[in-house]
Amino acid sequence: FAQEARAVMASVLRLGRDELATMLQLSPKLRDEGTARLRTFFDPDVTELPAALSYTGMVFRKLSASTFTAEDWAWAAEHLRITSFVYGLLSPQTAIRYDRMEGAVQLPDLYDGRLFDYWRDHLTPYLIEEVQRAGGTLLFLASDEMRGLFHWAEVERAVRVITPTFLVRQPTGKLKQIVVYTKMARGAMAGAIIRQRLEEEEAWRALTPEGFVFSPEESSDRDWTFVLG
């Protein structure tokens, strides 16, 4: 989706600095640096990195793609896809540039709606085709909002979607989602699957990412719950 990514960024860069900073919810401290970095997107000498190394959030820290072997990278290229509001859907090896963006951003000269809406028709058939080619099951480890990039009901009709949830048991016995732990577990789970070449659901359930353990009592066929504590 390189052509679409260029169109998105060309439209983004027509916005003023303050308008762009507001859309991206940048703090005053980050406004100048963040918008300046985006404005280098089309510079010919800008550094590009593989997508799995370009992002620095907690999920990607725990994925730890910098420690992948050549065989890990090859397997990940066949089995892992990364969502992006600028690039759409990425292979972990695809070289990209800095692309901080929000799905709710509206770019009237590109599309009559949000970036979420812009991408749905592009990405839905592609994701379905990729999942079917890889065996027909999607283990969804992205954040919940990323469903908005797709016609999600159509995806769920076409392929088997499994969504893990990671919950921490409180002293009261209640289960609670803690966002940073969820991000850590998602990245660790993806990394373990890649390094161990795991393709069976039973093997996925047996994983204990960041200490979270699969709980049959709290899970259904497609909504899996992993519990810590």
PLM feature spans:
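Active-site helix-to-loop segments that bind/position phosphate- or nucleotide-bearing substrates
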Residues: F1-T67
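Internal, well-folded beta-alpha domain core
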Residues: A65-G229
